[in-house]
Structure formats: structure tokens, C-alpha cells
Amino acid sequence: GAICIVEVEARERFEAPPGFTPVDERRYGRARLVFLRAA
């Protein structure tokens, strides 16, 4: 199970690509980190 971390703008819409499942999300100021696990 690989983990992938994606950084996007806090208000940006993000959809996990096929084969990945979001497992956590954190905000830091204007940034948002989305943690994905390979399915």
C-alpha cells in the first residue's frame, strides 16, 4: 500500500485519480494536503 501526498490550494477542488483512495486531509494556511492510498 503506497501513500501519495498531493498539495493543492485550500479551496481547490480535488478528485482522487482512479486506483487511489483519500485517507486524510490537512490544511496549512492557503495549502491543503491530501493523503491518498493506492487501492
What feature does the model see in each segment?
Residues 1-39:
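Class I S-adenosyl-L-methionine-dependent methyltransferase catalytic core
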